[in-house]
Amino acid sequence: MVHSTLKRQTAPVRDIYYSVIIPAYNEEAFLPDTLAGLHLAMKAIPQKGEIIVVDNDSTDSTAEIARKAGARVVFEPFRQIARARNSGARAARSALLVFLDADTILPPALLNQALTLLASGTCCGGGTVLNFDAPLPFLAGRLIKFWNWISRTNRLAAGSFIFCLARAFHATGGFDEKTFAGEEIFLSRRISAWGKKQNLLFTILEKHPVITSSRKFHWYSSLQIALLLLLFSIFPFALRSRLLCRFWYTRPMK
């Protein structure tokens, strides 16, 4: 059973076609480029969209940067990625949702492809394969190639970029707030199952990958990351532990 604070959606606004939701905690270094890239992508879409940045209790200028860039800022005080994403979805005023990480560049062609699919009546949601903004260590590169294969084969979206029908998102309960990481995997499965009943596909796009930050692969060794992922694959209930998921919540001291 999904545990979520997602209880209602803001009533859709007729002239807002899609919503891009960005969860952000202390992302003043990456958010400007992410928003600049997003604005560029949105210019290529004829329909009107909105940007929602969820300030997840930041202590830096994340919220100010978002407002200056024209985004709506939603405050979520509880530090949890799933809850931040749900808060953004709850505030969204459209029928199409796009979730984008604050350290990720969205290619214009990818946004167009995702929205076109959602509007086609054949797709309930999906994600994309990953590229990174800098070369990765050898083992890390192999891990990402393996993940991209798993993503395509099993139709599992990475959290960096997820798109879906708002009705599918709300019908399946949104992101599970019992977990502190991996919530995108569980959501992918639930929306895919929901879509199957509606004759709608959950698809992983490959032609225009997002470009996301490689910072974690430089903060931690590839072996550390590989062992952590192995732990979660064997013991998925460990994703309910904030301590065990600290990889996603702590950063090295500057």
Where are these regions (language model features)?
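Short, well-formed alpha-helical segments that are part of the catalytic scaffolds
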Residues: 6-7, 27-42
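Cell-envelope/extracellular polymer assembly enzymes that use nucleotide-activated donors
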Residues: 17-19, 50, 186
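Short beta-strand/loop segment that forms part of the nucleotide-sugar
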Residues: 47-57, 74
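A conserved acidic beta->alpha catalytic loop
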Residues: 55-63, 104
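Glycine-rich, basic loop-to-helix element that forms the pyrophosphate-binding segment
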Residues: 76-92
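Short aromatic/hydrophobic "clamp" motif used to bind/position activated sugar donors
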Residues: 97
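Conserved donor NDP-sugar-binding/catalytic core segment of glycosyltransferases
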Residues: 108-138
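A short, conserved alpha-helix in the catalytic core of glycosyltransferases
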Residues: 168-172, 179-199, 203
